[in-house]
Amino acid sequence: GVRKRFLTIMSDRAYRPAQSLCMLFYMALDLCDAGTSWKAEVPKYGDAPFRKELADAVEHAGADCRAAFVERNELFLDLAENYRKEGLYRAFLTSAAEEAEQIAEDYGKIRKEDLDAFAQAFSPYEALMRCYLQSEIFSECLGEPDDVEYVTVKLQWIALEYAAIRHAAFLCWHREGALSYETMRSCMVILSR
């Protein structure tokens, strides 16, 4: 089924977790567009050459890194504000939210070199994030076997969590100059609630 194909794609270490998520969205939207014949489309996603072609298309889609960064920062600020209103996770969120607010004042101060350096600091945790995403997909994408739209909505929520976790890790890294396992764990635990 769909969840099995999602897990196959997410477990493929040939692709970064973020790239795998984009592939999953393409698959989910493709299945939604297929209408009542969507079940006939599922098997092609089990084919390794097809997945490679899909990954190449995702890689060359030309996403605007600056706009994506701004969106992640705004998402994080929204989540942080919601947690603040509830009085939750202040010890962790205060410094990360302050960093996000400072960045929001002038997005131009975040350079491509900063994002590349963060990608290097984050890379040791990609396997951890892949396991997290697999677990989320396994547990959250349980919907009705015939309800592709339900699974697509669940996948959107998982992607939002991933984006928030990764951005919180960026904020901590940017503020502290390093990304420890403990910091990464805090990002995952707090922002996946």
Residue positions per predicted region:
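Hydrophobic, aromatic-lined core segments that form the binding pocket/scaffold
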Residues: R3-R193
